[in-house]
Amino acid sequence: MGMSEIAKAAQKDKAIGGADRDSHTPMMQQYLRIKAQHPDTLLFYRMGDFYELFFDDAEKAARLLDITLTTRGQSAGTPIRMAGVPFHAVEQYLARLVKLGESVVIAEQVGEPGATKGPMERAVSRIVTPGTLTDAALLDDRIDSLLLAATLHRGVLGLAWLNLANGDLRVMECPAEQLQAQFERLRPAEVLVPDGLALPLVESLSPVLRRLADWQFDAGNGERLLTAHFGTRDLAGFDAEGLPVALAAAAALFEYARSTQRQSLEHVTGLRVEREAEYLRLDAATRRNLELTETLRGEASPTLFSLLDSCITSMGSRWLRHALHHPLRDRGVAAQRHGAVGELAGSDAGAPADIGDARMLGAVRAALRGVADVDRITARIALRSARPRDLAALSDSLARLPQLHAALGTPQAPLLCDLLAAIAVPDNALDLLVRAVAAEPAAAVRDGGVIAPGFDAELDELRGIQSNCGEFLLALEVRERERSGIATLKVEFNKVHGFYIEVSHANTGKVPDDYRRRQTLKNAERYITPELKAFEDKALSAQERALAREKLLYEALLEALAAHIPALQRIARALACLDGLGAFAEAAVRHSYVCPQFSAQPGVDIIGGRHPVVERQVEDFISNNCRLAPTRRMLLITGPNMGGKSTFMRQVALIALLAHVGAFVPARSARLGPLDAIFTRIGASDDLASGRSTFMVEMTEASAILHGATEQSLVLMDEIGRGTSTFDGLALAFAIARHLLEKNRCLTLFATHYFELTRLNGDYPECANVHLDAVEHAHRIVFLHAVEDGPASQSYGIEVAALAGIPGSVVREAKRRLRALENREVGNGPQADLFAALPDREPATPSHPALTALAELDPDTLSPREALERLYALKRMTA
């Protein structure tokens, strides 16, 4: 039976007990009812110790999980295809499915066996989707997993996103053209959009796209849902009024999240409105080109994040990743972070961090070791899905807070003072955890041993019955041996037959009259007595009652801890921030970074700047200065390929970005004026998914810069125009450079191989020529990587080609053509004549045979003996 058949069965048989339903077995009737409510989602249907999947779900799961597909029995005359996974290993299978973008409905057994006629009652307990994960086994501990809803109205993009694993809910409105930039910033795991909205770009940007009914995106409903959830009359306290498109997205998001969890989201305690002006604008191309958290090849390292992430906790790593994608416009907040980093690193403002003075940093990082993911544990407490070991880890983490207080001492930096106050130990919560949770609890409540001894008298009594079992059996064995006269009599227990007295066949004639046979073995008989039976009932009952009592106590414990959720969230945020700032301080100490300075004067002034990632990959990295100001708005950068132009430009952008996220920077000094955005146009490749060529991608990115850059924007333009013909490219590069100088008036680093552009500074004094030089030494090119004033003398493109292994004959032909081009006037003719007008050979001029022979030599292909022979031949020619 496929999905279409299931849907038909559900449609035909809406009334329970209808004629069509009677054709299925009672269990399959129950399955079909649940499946009809979730037709597009895999259904894990609990049956004893397994979660079973049926029909098309079984085939799909077997294919994705590489599990066995089988057929068992029939329903309505159709063989039932099925596959299953053991319940104790379900999380690992769920993790694999979620990584593949699948969603799963979990239907648990909620009734007691035999309590009702027919199959045991089952109900959906949760829905697992890529954007609504909270279980540690399903999440990447260093990456936030976001659920995002997006809708569009009259050119305004409304976004709402929720990190269900910590309760962080945010909304924003922005122009529709920022869709790609926002998706690149947030990287949602799952996206919700209205069914009637055509957003083809979303489909290419999101791995998991879910279309919901248009009516679910309703601003009025969004406001009602949120005010009811927060218990407020309106959303003015969250500064969320006047955002109808964002609230429409929030309506769909919040309802969807609640439906997957099957409960209220009490850990969502606030709503944050993000505004465009909060952060430096980084478009999608800039985030990729600067390789903040992912290389251009899609790898995790080497990136700025991989360099800086020395965080002790997973919370700190997530804070750091978020910070790198959200450079602050509020320079006061960024400066507060600088102050905290400086105090942790033991550095005065403007001076490089000194490893010898970083005593506070070492103490703080030592105190953070052993701190668990308080952020996500708190969310699981709110959702009542926290495991016993989560609570033990939370208890240990809270117990370390006094050590962290001692490590911070009496800080001077205002931000450190705020963090110190935020990590105040919630004594009631810690006391409750210490008293209630066993030191080393079992993985699951069903296994017992979760609640600590002494916490509950009734549980202790029930456990006492179980623990005294051995003593009772030993005493009973001694008494029964004396009573029966059977010296080899044994009193034992197993899970199948319970308690019994074992007597060998040779002694069965001696057993007392009150012995009742329980089992016959080859060499012995097993008996039970009224006394032993009474104890068995009591012991086994005590075990069941103890487990039931422990489950009840655990649920009550989660309920009690839920009252501390706001305090635990405050602590988690502070720990994450402190750990992230510690990573900034660690980088400053290890790599000699300095505190950047903010200035009210426009411009960028960097002395001895370095690329933070590249300098760790190479030896003897060459630092460079960069000065941009109102009288020096554009640096026109020329120089050879591989000379370091792109590295120089990227390092300027990264230094600016690091300063605005609150980190120290790789330079001897850095002073930055006001910035509102960083744009980059560096490199390009075909966008096959969107049907765009390399040149189209290049022009699209350039267009975004020309339309979006302001006087306070930092713009990086690398070899614009190279994707088309020489004259077209030169014309475009010239026009774009002039537009940036005249219209945008932004701070620009403009790298080019078009030397004609170096004449721009004749018309625009604010355009300065700089170059990265190279020299030829011993017939090889040596890149100096130092930025010098003035234009470059040549590009050394042919020499770089030779370094890349281009055959010598090709290199020689290229040099010959280059000389011919340099020795003639190109004029204003069409580019097609550039090579067509060249003769196949240079004009014939008398030359010595020895010179001709020497020109034809390729020394790289000669053996020592052949080289010596050619040398003697040349000598003879000149004799």
UniProtKB/Swiss-Prot annotation:
Keyword line: ATP-binding, DNA damage, DNA repair, DNA-binding, Nucleotide-binding
Gene3D superfamilies linked: 1.10.1420.10, 6.10.140.430, DNA repair protein MutS, domain I, MutS, connector domain, P-loop containing nucleotide triphosphate hydrolases
SMART domains in alphabetical order: MUTSac, MUTSd
One MF annotation (Gene Ontology) recorded for this entry: damaged DNA binding
Keyword Calcium in annotation: no
Family per record: Belongs to the DNA mismatch repair MutS family.
Protein name per UniProt: DNA mismatch repair protein MutS
Lineage: Bacteria, Pseudomonadati, Pseudomonadota, Betaproteobacteria, Rhodocyclales
Gene encoding the protein: mutS
